[in-house]
A protein has these predicted regions:
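Short amphipathic alpha-helix that is part of the acyltransferase structural core
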Residues: 1-31
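Short, basic/aromatic recognition patches
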Residues: 31-37
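A short helix-loop-beta-strand connector motif used in the catalytic cores of GNAT acetyltransferases and
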Residues: 37-49, 58
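Conserved beta-strand in the GNAT
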Residues: 49, 54-63, 70-71
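Conserved acetyl-CoA binding element of GNAT-fold acetyltransferases
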Residues: 67-79, 108-110
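Conserved acetyl-CoA-binding loop-helix of GNAT-fold acetyltransferases
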Residues: 82-96, 118, 122
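Conserved beta-strand-loop-alpha-helix junction that forms the acyl-donor binding cleft
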Residues: 106-118
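Conserved catalytic-core motifs of GNAT/GCN5-like acyltransferases
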Residues: 108, 126-128
Length: 128
């Protein structure tokens, strides 16, 4: 069973975000080195753990883009990727619409990250 759980545990967040198979895909030229990364903990930022049958599979981070729109960032651990990844995003969308004021979810996908683009499209997101 897939669950989504809000967290403010800095160590857990950091361990996922700076993972060698995640950080290079979510950082940019102005990001700190992974060893210097510190997550921002604030009520306006939702750090959401993904668990599958109790096993930690990664996290989603959402933050407000405007009054009804949130921006999504996805960090799925390599051992949990594959066919179940779309289940994680669908569960996330349910969580967002049940627990926040947001009515729309957006994400930005760099051109080099084809796996993220496939996940977004399989999860029902559309290009705008």
């Amino acid at each position: 069973m897939v669950t989504i759980e809000r967290t403010s545990d800095i160590d857990t967040i950091k361990s996922i975000v700076i993972h060698n198979d995640i950080y290079p895909f979510i950082s940019d030229d102005y990001s700190p080195l992974a060893t210097d990364y510190e997550p921002i903990i604030d009520d306006s930022i939702y750090w959401l753990l993904i668990k599958n049958s109790g096993v930690l599979c990664g996290l989603f981070m959402i933050h407000q883009s405007n009054g009804i729109t949130c921006e999504l960032h996805t960090c799925v651990l390599p051992e949990c990727r594959g066919s179940k990844t779309t289940l994680y995003t669908k569960k996330l969308f349910d969580w967002i619409f049940e627990n926040t004021q947001f009515k729309k979810v957006i994400t930005h996908v760099p051109s080099f990250n084809s796996a993220a683009l496939v996940l977004a499209e399989k999860s029902g997101m559309k290009r705008e």
